[in-house]
Structure formats: C-alpha cells, structure tokens
A protein has these predicted regions:
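Bacterial N-terminal signal peptides
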Residues: 6-21
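Signal peptide processing junction and immediate N-terminal pro/mature segment
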Residues: 18-31
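Central antiparallel beta-sheet cores of small beta-barrel/beta-sandwich binding domains
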Residues: 28-122, 126
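N-terminal, Lys/Arg-enriched amphipathic/low-complexity engagement segments
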Residues: 140-189
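Short, structured beta-strand/loop micro-motifs enriched in basic residues and often containing a Trp
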Residues: 149-158, 190-197, 298-306
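Short, well-ordered loop/turn sites that connect or cap secondary structure elements
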Residues: 167, 203-206, 315
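Glycine-rich anion/phosphate-binding loop at the beta-strand->alpha-helix junction
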Residues: 211-365, 405, 412-413, 418-436, ...
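Extended amphipathic ligand-handling, pore-lining, and cofactor/metal-binding catalytic surfaces
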Residues: 371-388, 392-401
Length: 455
C-alpha cells in the first residue's frame, strides 16, 4: 500500500531485481501479468493519478482470465473483476491498507478513480481520479546514432524542461558539454555558470518505475585548459587549517596535455614547478529528472537519489550508470566535465573543463534502483548522497543492501555477511550541499552467488 500519509517516500520504493551485469542483457523480463495479454486489459499499465493538481505516476500489472482480474498495483497484490469495459479491483499492502480502483477501458485508455485507505487512518480515505495507458513498447529496428550539438543549457534538473532530443533504448548520442562556468571547447561563454547541463534527452519507453541505463562510451577532452581553485572546502577544514586557508580562494588555471596524458599548473609556484597529475576525464553530473511532485526542483549543483551533481570520479569512459526513472521519458541530463579530480572534490572545483561525450541508453522496465548505481569492469558501486558524510554513508550502505537483496535474493543476514567482508568505502563528494559516500564491491566476490532469477 502506498500510504497517503507517507506517499512521497513510499511511492518510489525499490523494485529492481533482475538487473544484470553491464556485459549481459538488460532486457529484464516483465512480470507474468504483463506477458499474458489475452485481453484488452492484460498488460503493464502506466497510471497518472491526480493528487490535488499534481501528477503522481504508478505502474500496475493486470491479468484477466474469464472475467477475473489479478496482478499488482505498485507492488501490492490485487484481485478484482472485469465486466465488459468496466474493471474493479482492490490491492492490499502488508499493513492492511488498500487501494480500490474502479474504472473503464476505452480505445486503449483506462480512466476512473482510486480510493486510498491508510491502515492507520481507515476513517479518512482519499479519492483520486486517474488515467492509464499500456506501457509503450520498444521501437523495432536497428538502434540509431545521433549527432547532437547543444544550443540550450539548463541549470536545473527539472521535469518541466523541454527535451532537446528524443532517443530510443539502444540509441547512441554523441554530444558536448560546457564546463561548470558555462564555457565551451572554444573558450566562448555560452551560458551563466552553475553546472549548466546538456539535455534533457527524452528516452522513449522509459516510464516511472523503470531504471535508465547510461553507458558512457566516450568521455574525452576537447580543449587544453581547465580552471580549479586553491582552497579547501569547509568539510575538510579543522580550526587550524581553516586559519591557514582563510585567504586562499582564487582560481587556478591548468594546462591539459592530452598527448602526455597529464595536467600541469600554467603558473606554478616554485615548489610545484614539476608537479603533474594524470588526466582522467569524468562527468560530475549525470541525472534523471525528479518527479513533477517533487517539493522543489533541484538546481544543477544539487544531487540526490536522481543522481545529479555527484562529482564521483568513477563516472568515466567505460562506466555504466543506473538511475531511477521518475517522470515519463526519464529526461537525462549530463554535464560538469572534470579533466581530473581527487576523491571528494576537495577544492570545491575540480579541473573544470568542457567535454566530448558519447553515451548509449537503455531501459530496464518495471525495475527501479533506489539511487545511483555505477558499474565498472571490476566493481559495482552504490552512491549515497545526503546532508552529512554520516548520512551519505548510511544511504550508500542501504542502496547496496537493496541491490544485493534484489539481485541475489539474499536475506538480511546474508547481506550483512557480504558487506562486512567485501565493502570498500570512498568519500566521493564533500564540496556541495550533499556529501557523497560510495560503497564498492569487487564483482569477483559476487560471481559465486546465484542470481534471484536462477533461484
């Protein structure tokens, strides 16, 4: 039951068992109710419910046999009937709450009302109108490659922003990003700074309750300089270091030598005359849009379960990012390229630069991660983002626990045994409002575990 009293927490609950390795297939099987399409009612439906003028999205699976209706509504098992074009069912949650649906189906569209009854407050049910359509199917044919030159850059991860390009699962997009200050590869400032993003990209068939898969096939430099800072952010300072750093907040320009694969200071001090760092291009921002019901639209410097300004230095060429879909089309944003960055983005700005980017998208239908998951050739990584390092640590741990439970059907005790012996933690972000902590597990440790589907 999606309790009305805690709707915005529970309606985005995790349902993502069946996610497979980046090297395997991502076409996760839909539940049996969606596969059995023996009537105009059976299938996977996307519901748009009207909560006091705000759209809230759900998924439900229906199976009709001889007038009897079974399936699930947002994870709650349902039973009901079909009489002509009229459907009626009741779904029940583990706490005893219910969702009662009465609707009609006409020309492939369902409409009607839901009555939500909270087990803790049964005397005050709430009634909401809805419409629903069968979940869209993947487009047939060969995946396309798109060349996209951005002309508009948004500074919010909003579901209201107009998509710049529509793509299908399996498609690849080649594009560019400006740097965090809004400057492009030619040194031309195109937009006000503040992590302006390329996108959003509308991904066909991606619906709330799905997982968006973003494979970064190319993250390359497209200019030879970057801007950073010479200070340390407040989370990294104690009293004595803070006093030493009080006058240190000026910009520092770096030279990017792609041929040698290193970055050096353009005007180094005597002690740093021979100092260099390896180039490791990354994207600070990869995000899907939060839902229309979000209390506030996050700016492009913010982060959360939708991804956003994660500033995680493993979001590099070859990485795959899994993000929850919370609005139709997912609305994918990318930006904030860094030529190199230490853990935490300790200076406040990394080596900020524009970037040449190519990515491929996919959709895992009916399964959703609770927050960003990053996969490399060697590790699976759960990103936790919250207001303090302690809270981000908890988020990363919970996200990985959910992933292990869903993928391998582990019990809580088994999850604890795996995490207690295999977890590797990194502080990924300390520069912005939310801190970031990442829990990594080497994938070799997990190879002996049977997946949930195999069980």
């Amino acid at each position: 039951m999606l309790r009305v009293s805690s709707l915005f927490v529970s309606l985005f609950s995790l349902v993502f068992s069946g996610i497979v390795s980046v090297n395997g297939s991502h076409a996760a099987d839909a539940p049996a109710a969606a596969r059995a399409s023996n009537s105009g009612v059976s299938g996977r439906w996307i519901i748009n419910a009207d909560f006091y003028g705000t759209a809230i999205f759900y998924q439900m699976y229906l199976k009709e046999e001889s007038g009897k209706l079974t399936g699930d509504f947002a994870g709650d098992k349902l039973e009901g009937t079909v009489t002509g074009d009229t459907i009626h069912f009741v779904a029940k949650d583990e706490q005893g709450g219910t969702e009662e649906c009465t609707g009609t189906v006409k020309d492939g569209t369902m409409s009607g009302t839901f009555v939500f009854t909270d087990a803790d407050d049964p005397a005050h049910p709430s009634t909401h109108a809805f419409t629903a359509t069968i979940a869209p199917q993947r487009r047939a044919g060969v995946p396309q490659r798109h060349e996209f030159t951005p002309t508009t850059f948004y500074r919010q991860f909003s579901s209201a922003n107009k998509p710049v390009l529509t793509v299908s699962p399996g498609d690849t997009v080649h594009t560019t990003t400006v740097d965090a200050g809004g400057t492009d590869e030619k040194g031309v400032t195109r937009v006000l700074g503040g992590n302006p993003e390329t996108g959003p990209f509308f991904v066909e068939t991606a619906m709330p309750g799905d997982t968006l898969v973003v494979r970064l096939t190319r993250v390359r430099l497209n200019r030879d300089w970057a801007i950073s800072d010479d200070g340390i952010v407040p989370r990294g300072l104690n009293t004595s270091l803070s006093l030493k750093m009080k006058d240190r907040e000026k910009s520092v320009r770096w030279h990017l030598d792609a041929a040698r694969g290193v970055a050096t200071l353009e005007k180094p001090s005597e002690h740093l005359a021979h100092y260099s760092v390896p180039l490791r291009p990354m994207l600070g921002c990869v995000a899907t849009a939060p839902p229309p019901a979000a209390a506030a639209t996050p700016g492009a410097g913010d982060s959360g379960s939708f991804g956003g300004n994660m500033d995680f230095n493993e979001v590099i060429e070859g990485a795959t990012i899994y993000l929850p879909v919370r609005t139709p089309g997912a609305l994918l944003y990318l930006g904030d390229g860094h030529a190199a960055q230490g853990d935490g983005e300790l200076n406040g700005n990394a080596l900020e630069t524009s970037m040449d980017v190519e990515f491929t998208v996919d959709v895992i239908p009916g399964k959703r991660v609770p927050g960003p998951i990053v996969e490399s050739a060697t590790h699976i990584m759960a990103v936790g983002l919250d207001g303090s390092i302690d809270d981000a640590f908890r988020e990363a741990t919970a996200n990985m626990a959910d992933w292990l439970e869903a993928k391998y059907a582990l019990t809580p005790s088994e999850v604890a045994e795996v995490l207690g012996t295999s977890a590797e933690y990194k502080v990924s972000e300390v520069a912005d409002r939310n801190a970031g902590v990442v829990l990594r597990i080497n994938k070799e440790r997990l190879q002996v575990l049977p997946t949930a589907a195999a069980k």
